[in-house]
Amino acid sequence: MERNFIDGYTEWQSNPEIVGVNKLPQHATFMPYENFDEAKKADRFASSRSKLLNGKWKFKLYKNYAYRPSDFAQPHYDTHNWDTIKVPGSWQMQGYDQAQYCNVRYPWEGSEDICPPNAPTKHNPVGCYVKKVHIDKSLLNKRVVICFEGVESAFYLYINGERVGYSESTFHRSEFDISKYIKEGSNVIGVEVYRWCTGSWLECQDMWRLGGIFRDVYIYTTEKQYIRDFEVVAEPDVTLSDGYADILVKTNGSYESLSLDLSILDKDGNTVALDSQYANEDHQTKLKAIVTDVNVWSSESPYLYTMVITLKDNGMPIEYISQKIGFRKVEIKDGIIRINNQRVVFKGTNRHEFDCHTGRYMSEDVMRYDIEMMKKSNMNAVRTSHYPNDPKFLELCDEYGLYVIDENNMETHGTGWSTIVGCPQLPASRPEWEKACMERIKATYNRDKNVTSVVCWSLGNESLGGAIPKKMYQFIKDTDKTRFVHFECHRAPDEKELSDVQSKMYARPWECEEYAVTQRDGRPYILCEYTHAMGNSCGSTDEYTRLWDKYPCLQGGFVWDWVDQSILTKDENGKEYLAYGGDFGENPHDGHFCGNGLLFGDRKVTPKLCEIKKLYQNVDFNAIDAARGVIEVKNKFMFTNLNEYELHWSQSSDKGEFCSGTLVLDVKPGEKTVIDLELSRIKTECYLNLELKTKEDNEYCKAGHIVAEEQFVINEFENTYDELEVDQPLIVDDTYGSLRVISDDVNVRFERRERNQLYSIKVGGEELLSAPMRLNFWRALTDNDRGTRAGSRLGCWRDAGDTPGIFNNTKWSINNYKVLEDGKKVIITGGATVCTQPESKAQVIYTITSKGMEVDLQFYPDASLPEIPEVSVLFELPKDFENLTYLGNGPEENYIDRCNAAKIGLYNTTVNDLWVDYLKPQECGNRTGVRYATLVGNKKVFSVVAEPQMELNVCHYLPKEIENVWHQKDMPEYNKTVVRLIARQQGVGGYDSWGAHCNDMYKNKTDKTYRLKFQIRF
């Protein structure tokens, strides 16, 4: 609808009811095609009727609207001295302005004293874009439309100097009919982009706040009579035998001469259904088709048909459009979400559109990478947090098979937490915001209504309730009967009237179970956000996934979040690093709270994703008799028989694999079977490994990809620890300064003056230690630790162990020693007083032979003290101890509350490879279940064996050195190798990152004794 502009530019500045000027109505995503062959390929930008305007544009950034030239879009305006910028792309990612990361706060807080609905005026950069486009004479009698898929956050459009229109809402499409503004030959397109506008009050998502044209820009043409919109409902019958397609087509032009043909093609291009109808006088025509023996669409089998609609004028084709469609049924029945008659569990992730190189702009390659990684990680769902994603991403979700919660572009989190005096909660029931909110939900629906993978609409995020969200909810319920509605508004008193599902983010597992058992209100329960993946996190995720199997109404969740929102940049020395909030001098900001990804900012996989993949797998293996190889296998797929995969099994020990085989299991969805591998019984510890693998390449992975796996430990800890061999006689030299135990090749020395510590181990004349052995009770704070204020709350443990330069925090003693077995074994008994307040105690027994030394440590914390981050013994070795072999859980980093994906094996790695590049340096690289480990450096060997097991952490830094650094690039040059032999380290947690402790079962409480027993082999 056309309207006049208001003088004074109030569109962006102060009037929330103006959300667009001269914009075309929102419609489904489609492109007109010239012929049937073009249309059936369904490649929008391959259409001869479309022209992408992506690429180089002239660009200049101004401080605010008062500084920008009003005539920059005039054909005569000289822009040859302007910069060139890439479109699509955020301008901050190309050297202009400051990127600003904010979670809850609005980015202008503290810099401009404004309240809703006013937009900032002093610091509100305006980017002016200019591009010249050639228009052929043949297009002058056509309808020509320009489309912007995403502009942050508002813009005016100019053609040849004339102001065409205005639009806001960053993540929604904006289209303008420019037919009357263009001319033959060169045409000047001018776009005036405002970083913030009135609509920015509705865009307080946890993300980087950027600016610019960040999605595709293109022109397309139609005849004067054209298809303006269409809606498809494609569902199978109750038996999933036949598919029924109902299509409503809206046309423009004289209906008397118009008709429409429908063709539905299968994957092989065969026509499987047809229909033809004349246009109706209301310009809405219904087409119908039945596809017999239909292939239904699901995340497991995303079969897509191609629908082509031909518009004819007096029997002659004038336009073709197409759409990939899948037949699937989504319903809530008896309080359970079902897809194609089956209960679904959403094994999902949230995903912001963010790339460390390009900001908001997402290339198709990155989109495909993300989806392929999700599929490889057993994910079946994604939530487009917190706005509609690029239409191409949804097309790819159709193609690969992901269930989508399509979230509307509305979050007003900051109005509930604002430091701005007088700032009201939005939108609530405030009438001045109704139009903007309703336009946004309508735009989301209309753009994506034909997307098969969209199974749920989300009204927005963290915006509470009120009359306006109720109207948004009712619009969807009145308009779409084929999907359910979600809204994260748990704290709102009217929450039940706004969402078809219960969705409390970051609910604890016991809260979920309580809902299922005692508080269920008839709705299914989905965790729209859970297991906050900030830094070293995602502990206890298995506590959730177990509940999804146990209670039908608990139907999954979405990890927060997919990828760290970090920006690849360079420091003042030209060194590349991944930046977070505050690194660009911006204020306010929320630091590294943007680092919540299962992938790092450069999209490398984190160990957290390995855990999620394991917990999301669709096959359970349960041991009936693991030693014999009798295993129950349960198929948790909804539609897939396990005979589509191969089960590879192997039996191994620390010496390697010694038997293996392959099976194909015929197990239908939801059913179980028992396999018997008829293994021979073995007396020592060994491991039965099961891996279910793909037989062939598919859309997202190669043949041999592991979709499910399990390991069973047989004869756990049998024959993994032997007594030290007694060989050569020993000499005990007990002088005032030291106590030494000496053999031909070994010299073990304890300091005797003040510390009474194990001070030196020499083997073959080579020193193994760089510093005395000491107790350690600290780990470098994780992001979750910081969230619980562990630095101050547990600070009594930080220096409780022996710390260089700090004396009298642990007082060691040597009580006595004795020589046994004809002088070939020495036992030294000692202890330690740990100077906590009150004091804690330790006892230690050293047993030494010429072949090694056993350390048997028992620690008795005072029960009044808070939990202990870690109980360990710490060694500093020379830095050239780099190569590590260990028998324990791996290959990835693992912790006691995040080790489901870990398998016991003999792993060869390096100390540097154990390090994990979390956005802010923190505790990392741990290994649990370690039986033995050997470090090698410069021909020296440091070998330890645990009784029966320990945790192991090896890196080049002390814990306190790590937590004093804010970026990976600032980690200092290392000069040592730090080995922590750990009795027990606390879990990493992950319920949330702003106060949630790890589960009590994973805490190191002080009402118990801790024991660490190990040997150092010479």
Where are the regions a protein language model picked out?
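Extended substrate-binding grooves/exosites of carbohydrate-active enzymes
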Residues: 2-45, 104, 162, 201, ...
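Extended acidic/polar, glycine-enriched regions
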Residues: 182-184, 250-331, 686-725
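An acidic-aromatic loop/edge-strand motif
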Residues: 90-93, 98, 102-119, 168-170, ...
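Accessory carbohydrate-binding/adhesion or oligomerization-edge regions at the termini
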Residues: 1-107, 188, 192, 196, ...
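Beta-strand/loop-rich accessory regions of lumenal/periplasmic or secreted enzymes
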Residues: 93, 102, 195, 298, ...
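Beta-strand-rich binding/interaction modules
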Residues: 159, 242-278, 285, 631-662, ...
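Catalytic cores of secreted or luminal carbohydrate-active enzymes
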Residues: 203-227, 574-632, 636-656, 680-721, ...
